[in-house]
Amino acid sequence: MRVVKLVEISELKTGPFGTQFSANEYVIDGIPVINVKNIGYGNIIETGMGYVGQSTVERLSDHRLQEGDIVFGRKGSVDRHCLITKVQDGWMQGSDCIRVRITDSSVLPSFVSYYLLTDALKAKINNSAVGSTMASLNTDILGDIEINLPTYEEQCKIANILSSIDSKIENNNEINDYLEQKLRLLYEHMMSNVQTGGVTGHNTIASALTDIITGKEDANFASPAGKYKFFTCSNDTLRCDKYVFNASSILIAGNGDFNVKHYTGRFNAYQRTYVLMPGRKYYGLLYLASLYQINSFKSTSAGSIVKFITKGDIENIPVFIPDNEEVLSKINHLLMLQEQYQVENDELAALRDWLLPMLMNGQATIED
């Protein structure tokens, strides 16, 4: 085991800024640019991805990303980073990022990425960041981070077992994306047939199917090691120590990007999050009706200033209930499949997070 500073095994480079790269160089479709909002914990968040043309990437070729690069954000949640895989090779580093490129052939980039995800290292990065109002990271702070390096063979073993768990999680996410597409197609097909008279039923509104409840907690209620899920207006789901709700529920963000989620189990909710618990029969149907109504609300209000969704907006979500209950059963079946895969992912993530520090500090070893 040897201890090295990150700067000793890598090249650190900040993204292009100032006169090098301007916002008007972004295009609708092109080569993806990784900015702070696209950086998760070891992964890339593709929602809201920006794009630039080939000529921009060629001009700023020093900022072209390669497989194995590790990318941090310079501001905000500075303990987050993403590892560039073969899929993202050739993408561009954004202005507000720091790229770490491993230059030591005895160091495995994926091992370093996992090492940087340990709670101890994330806390060290957060504590080292500068700035009174917003945490800020620079190459000096990042380069000073110490890494405990086992042999290259041991690095490979550790990274392989952790990445196998992440691969299973990613596979489940892809299945859930497919199930979400099937759900939406099924709902759109039903609503299309309603217009032509091919499907009969009756119209109602959300408040006829369920009470509309809001969470009571503020953001400080979150606890990273909490046992229960804590739903806020963010796309990310947090954890907390106490639950209030225990049912199949639809959760609608009352501000922010107005996202719609569903979950079965014990949880708590932020004060601007609406909780709908319609019972199992109409669970999937109300989820889809809410999803499409909120998306419609967002698209019709584009360009105007909409700070929040009111309880009245939620109460009046239109819901068509088909006479054929087989449709409801199909929707619920797909929705519950999604939740089963998500439960498996939660268990896999917990296993990975339990193994991670133990493998890194030598408490657990991998036999051949």
Task: Outline where the language-model segments fall.
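Non-catalytic DNA-recognition/assembly elements of restriction-modification systems
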Residues: 1-17, 144-234, 323-367
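Extended, non-catalytic scaffold segments that flank or surround catalytic motifs
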Residues: 3-44, 109, 115-118, 126-127, ...
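Sequence-specific dsDNA recognition surfaces
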Residues: 7-23, 37-70, 206-247, 256-275, ...
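Short, conserved secondary-structure segments in the cores of folded domains
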Residues: 61, 87-88
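Short, charged beta-turn/beta-strand-edge "cap" motif at the junction between a beta-strand
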Residues: 76-80, 258
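A short glycine-rich beta-alpha junction/loop motif
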Residues: 90-98, 130-159, 269-271, 303-326
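Short, positively charged
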Residues: 110-141, 277-313, 318, 367
